[in-house]
């Protein structure tokens, strides 16, 4: 940001939340020409009030008015449906667990939004993500945010060189608590607004109930590791590896009295296998992943680095090698709990995000 000309026009994605509000303020303080854009990516509101488009737009407009910034409101819901949500449903139908936020960043926020912002005369876009961008000799790197507890590089690992070259992350060098304080000091209506959690189009609704409105139920058996029948499930799409909540099986059922967790899904038999406690079947050390994406030059394999198989996980030491089938093989130094097909595995070299891939199966 420091090297940009002050005549640079930046359009910031203003969501109606505290992060994008403060990001907008910081850009103005840097002296740039700033406009804002509110994205409507989903048509239906969460009735509980946690994912209200109307409320978010209202808050975004109040921030824009307070900062004297022009606000564009654009409906990208058709793009989101076609490029993100349909894929989300297809993956769940296969019994996998996709991450729509990763795809949303790649397809919507840093493609559709970027293209629209450029058509409005912007030189770059900005968002309230907690991540950093570094550039050296014309090559861009995605770095983790200064606030490790809020780092969002995991969700941004599919960005390419062009997208990074056109993007700014004003909050990358700031801690979340300081962002809140800045919002309070400036009297932002969003200062104490609850952070969005989970998938935005689901909000605080029950996940299985939401999914059931789009996917038909297919009853099958829930069995233990010995193949003993326990009860019926209503469809593999409604469960994920490592899941405990929603199984509705008391710990008293079984030998150990410990909680039950989803250990595996057998698509061919429409069977869900569950185990108790920290069972060995929940842990694996090797996985195969498809569609590897490297943010800069693809590394020479094999490669020693670290990886995350889910957001908020501490990076885990691993080695990446090439499989014969164009997939990559990842061997962790330690066993990993609940490796989940469909989820993203994201690779790091210290504070640099190298890229990632889609988990296909555990070995």
Swiss-Prot record:
**Quick one: which residues bind ATP?**
13-20, 39, 128
| A cellular component term, taken from the record's GO annotations | cytoplasm
Q: Where is the active site?
A: 104, 200
Record-marked site positions (Interaction with tRNA): 129, 343
Got any disulfides in this one, which pairs? 104-200
Keywords of this protein's UniProt record, alphabetized?
ATP-binding, Cytoplasm, Disulfide bond, Nucleotide-binding, RNA-binding, Transferase, tRNA processing, tRNA-binding
Q: Which residue stretches belong to region Interaction with tRNA?
A: 150-152, 310-311
Q: Where in the cell is it found?
A: Cytoplasm
Q: Quote the EC number.
A: 2.8.1.13
- Region span, Interaction with target base in tRNA: 99-101
Q: Name the reaction it catalyses.
A: S-sulfanyl-L-cysteinyl-[protein] + uridine(34) in tRNA + AH2 + ATP = 2-thiouridine(34) in tRNA + L-cysteinyl-[protein] + A + AMP + diphosphate + H(+)
User: Which CDD domains does the record match to this protein?
Assistant: MnmA_TRMU-like
- Any single biological process term in GO: tRNA wobble position uridine thiolation
The role this protein plays is: Catalyzes the 2-thiolation of uridine at the wobble position (U34) of tRNA, leading to the formation of s(2)U34.
| Family per record | Belongs to the MnmA/TRMU family.
> Which HAMAP family did the record assign?
tRNA_thiouridyl_MnmA (MF_00144)
Q: Any idea what this protein is called?
A: tRNA-specific 2-thiouridylase MnmA
Instruction: State which gene encodes it.
Output: mnmA
């Amino acid at each position: 940001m420091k090297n940009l000309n002050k005549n640079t026009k930046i359009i910031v994605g203003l969501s109606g939340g505290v992060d994008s509000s403060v990001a907008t303020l910081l850009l103005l303080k840097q002296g740039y020409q700033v406009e804002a854009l509110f994205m409507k990516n989903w048509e239906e509101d969460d009735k509980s009030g946690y994912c209200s488009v109307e409320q978010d737009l209202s808050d975004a407009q109040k921030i824009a008015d307070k900062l004297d910034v022009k606000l564009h409101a654009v409906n990208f819901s058709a793009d989101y449906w076609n490029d993100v949500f349909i894929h989300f449903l297809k993956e769940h139908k296969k019994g996998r667990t996709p991450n729509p936020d990763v795809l949303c960043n790649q397809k919507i926020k840093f493609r559709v939004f970027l293209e629209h912002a450029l058509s409005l005369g912007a030189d770059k876009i900005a968002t309230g993500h907690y991540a950093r961008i570094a550039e050296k000799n014309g090559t861009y790197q995605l770095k983790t945010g200064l606030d490790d507890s809020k780092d969002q590089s995991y969700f941004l690992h599919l960005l390419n060189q062009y997208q990074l070259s056109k993007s700014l992350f004003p909050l990358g060098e700031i801690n979340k608590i300081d962002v809140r304080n800045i919002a309070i000091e400036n009297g932002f209506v969003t200062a104490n607004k609850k952070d969005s959690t989970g998938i935005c189009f689901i909000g605080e609704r029950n996940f299985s109930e939401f999914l059931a409105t789009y996917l038909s139920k297919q009853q099958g058996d829930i069995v233990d590791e010995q193949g003993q029948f326990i009860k019926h499930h209503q469809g593999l799409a409604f469960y994920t590896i490592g899941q405990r909540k929603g199984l509705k099986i008391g710990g008293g059922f079984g030998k150990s009295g410990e909680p039950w967790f989803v250990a595996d899904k057998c698509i061919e038999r429409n069977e869900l296998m569950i185990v108790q406690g920290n069972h060995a079947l929940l842990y694996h050390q090797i996985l195969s992943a498809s569609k590897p994406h490297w943010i800069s030059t693809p590394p020479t394999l094999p490669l020693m680095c670290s990886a995350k198989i889910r957001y908020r996980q501490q990076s885990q030491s691993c080695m990446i090698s090439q499989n014969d089938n164009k997939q990559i093989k990842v061997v962790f130094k330690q066993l990993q709990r609940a490796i989940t097909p469909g989820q993203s595995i994201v690779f790091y070299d210290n504070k640099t995000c190298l890229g990632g891939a889609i988990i296909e199966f555990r070995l």
